Amino acid sequence: MRPARIIAAAGLALALAFCGTGAWTYARARGDDGLAYGRQRDAALTDGRRAIAVLNTLDASSPERARAGIRAWRAASTGPLRDELGRTEPRTGASARGTVTEAAVTALDPRAGTAKLIAAVRVEVTPAGSKTPTTDRKRLEAVLARTAAGTWKVQALNAVPLARTATEEDAR
């Protein structure tokens, strides 16, 4: 055999071994329960962050925009929270823009389709007739429910009390 054929055969064998190892690794990862759990956790976190930002945002500069904001709230929520938000009357007034700065899934039950999420939210509130917003920081806990479409929506939203720091206690 010529050296060129030996090198080509060795290269082909090496390529086949590499492809076989890749296929075997892919097949194992595809059926990995931990990987599936991680994907669901990531989906809950992504959808939950988006929904919490929506639920802390409202442009109330006009009745039409307030109505659109309330529709967005309803689209981001489910269950009793959605029903409660549906009873909200659109009014003009202060506008708010919520931004989720940090969030984490604290509990996930893929079989039941429920999750809990904690989030730190920065809310910029602009009073009606003012150009200067004030900033407020909130910590929230959300209970999420997976819908039939596979998306996660907020079922309950509660404020988490902030602990006072030593500096704040000294200021009192």
Model-derived regions, located:
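Short, low-complexity Ser/Thr-rich regulatory SLiMs
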Residues: 13-15, 107-109, 144-148
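Short beta-strand edge/turn micro-motifs at domain boundaries
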Residues: 137-172
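A mature extracytoplasmic/lumenal domain signature
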Residues: 89, 119-123, 158
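Surface-exposed, charged secondary-structure patches
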Residues: 94-130
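Core segments of small alpha/beta cavity-forming domains
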Residues: 37-95
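Juxtamembrane and targeting peptides
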Residues: 1-58
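Short, charged, low-hydrophobicity "junction" segments
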Residues: 19-28, 87-98
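Periplasmic/lumenal scaffold domains of single-pass inner-membrane subunits
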Residues: 125-143
